[in-house]
């Protein structure tokens, strides 16, 4: 049976969370934290800056923000949801990258434990693993549908007790494809009684899928499930760097004990509070515009002579298309030349992804505004035709 304490590193199990006087006393004459009581050194601060009390350390717990995130996610719960979330299920980080790194540090002993990924996938998993001296194992996604290979994953983790984390990106990056929810449920249930490890589902692009696709509302049912989210994509708030980890209350306690006490700034939380309440309608409008433009852009790209197939799916705010050479074959050489010419000659920056597994000739294109997309399509066709003359 799964036991979270069996995979937490021994030094984390005995960790005493950082506490400060402000945890117990929040009002009055506050002379406990060596802050500058005169205020922020900002010329003529505006009302917002004054209200945020930027000379004070931010709230280390962010309970109001956590509850708003929960309220938002529980509007469209996963169809398998049986239990409500609480603020004890959440840990906030400086972007999802902090959450990725924190999970590695929480459960993987450097030089001993391993992490399993399913390429093609997000590159930060491997970077964080390497930094933490954690061995990387791989089970590729199936092709051409970019779904998880359940038998291969089960075989891998059951045969190697040192694998402590399985990272899945859903919707995928660079694939743009949602992993079948039932497939992940199958893994969770199959491994719950025979594997001491965590299945981490990174849902950075989840708001571009059908409502109810998120697995975040299932973490109380599956103690071996962790879900990562961000406000960077659908909410258009990449600049505030806010990542959200949903997990069991027990695991969340350890993650919150590990994190730096004031990791979420007052500026970040102020913006996030507005976005996850008053900004929901705006976010949904943005998502609608992006998905509409995504379909238009993809249709036009696929009509071009030297563009092959849509390599990935349509569950994100980007497309991944296959660039062909003049013989009609997928070509990394042509894709790289197109990428470089667009960037240096036309000031249009896309992303070369042809080096990723099963993505030969791949260019990943984020969906911009209608005007940006028109310019992209014009220059993409012209430059690609010139290359293949």
From Swiss-Prot:
GO molecular function: histidinol-phosphate transaminase activity; pyridoxal phosphate binding
PROSITE patterns: AA_TRANSFER_CLASS_2 (PS00599)
Catalytic reactions on record: L-histidinol phosphate + 2-oxoglutarate = 3-(imidazol-4-yl)-2-oxopropyl phosphate + L-glutamate
Keyword set, alphabetical order: Amino-acid biosynthesis, Aminotransferase, Histidine biosynthesis, Pyridoxal phosphate, Transferase
Residues bearing PTM N6-(pyridoxal phosphate)lysine: 233
Transmembrane segments: none
InterPro entries documented for this protein: Aminotrans_II_pyridoxalP_BS (IPR001917), Aminotransferase_I/II_large (IPR004839), HisP_aminotrans (IPR005861), PyrdxlP-dep_Trfase (IPR015424), PyrdxlP-dep_Trfase_major (IPR015421), PyrdxlP-dep_Trfase_small (IPR015422)
Metabolic or biological pathway: Amino-acid biosynthesis; L-histidine biosynthesis; L-histidine from 5-phospho-alpha-D-ribose 1-diphosphate: step 7/9
Pfam families attached to this UniProt entry: Aminotran_1_2 (PF00155)
S-S bridge residues: none
Enzyme Commission no: 2.6.1.9
Record flagged with keyword Transferase: yes
Keyword Transferase: yes
Cofactor(s) listed: pyridoxal 5'-phosphate
GO biological process: L-histidine biosynthetic process
Family from the record: Belongs to the class-II pyridoxal-phosphate-dependent aminotransferase family.
Protein name: Histidinol-phosphate aminotransferase
Source species: Candida maltosa
Chain's gene name: HIS5
């Amino acid at each position: 049976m799964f036991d979270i304490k069996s995979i937490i590193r021994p030094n984390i199990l005995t960790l005493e969370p950082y506490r400060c006087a402000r945890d117990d006393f929040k009002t009055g004459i506050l002379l406990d934290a060596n802050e500058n009581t005169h205020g922020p050194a900002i010329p003529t601060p505006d009302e917002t800056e004054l209200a945020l009390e930027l000379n004070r350390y931010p709230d280390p717990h962010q309970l109001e923000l956590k509850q708003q995130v929960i309220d938002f996610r529980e509007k469209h719960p996963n169809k398998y949801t049986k239990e409500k979330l609480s603020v004890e299920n959440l840990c906030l980080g400086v972007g999802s990258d902090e959450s990725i790194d924190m999970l590695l540090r929480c459960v993987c002993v450097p030089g001993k434990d391993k992490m399993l990924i399913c390429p093609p996938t997000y590159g930060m998993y491997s970077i964080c693993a390497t930094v933490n001296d954690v061995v990387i194992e791989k089970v590729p996604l199936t092709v051409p549908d970019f779904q998880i290979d359940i038998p291969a994953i089960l075989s891998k983790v059951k045969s190697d007790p040192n694998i402590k984390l399985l990272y899945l990106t859903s919707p995928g990056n660079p694939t743009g494809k949602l992993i079948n929810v039932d497939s992940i449920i199958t893994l969770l249930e199959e491994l719950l009684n025979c594997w001491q490890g965590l299945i981490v589902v990174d849902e950075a692009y989840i708001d571009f899928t059908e409502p109810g696709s998120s697995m975040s509302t299932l973490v109380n049912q599956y103690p071996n499930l962790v879900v990562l989210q961000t406000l960077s994509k659908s909410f258009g708030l990449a600049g505030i760097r806010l990542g959200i980890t949903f997990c069991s209350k027990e695991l969340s306690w350890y993650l919150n004990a590990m994190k730096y006490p004031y990791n979420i700034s007052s500026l970040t939380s102020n913006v996030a509070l507005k976005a996850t309440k008053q900004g929901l309608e705006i976010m949904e409008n943005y998502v609608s515009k992006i998905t509409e433009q995504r379909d238009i852009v993809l249709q036009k790209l696929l009509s071009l002579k030297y563009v092959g197939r849509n390599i990935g799916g349509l569950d994100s705010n980007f497309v991944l298309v296959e660039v062909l050479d003049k013989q009609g074959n997928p070509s990394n050489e042509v894709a790289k030349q197109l990428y470089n010419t667009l960037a240096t000659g036309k000031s249009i920056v896309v992303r070369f992804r042809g080096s990723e597994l099963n993505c030969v000739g791949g260019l990943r294109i984020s969906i911009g505004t209608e005007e940006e997309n028109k310019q992209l399509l014009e220059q993409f066709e012209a430059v690609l035709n010139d290359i293949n003359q």
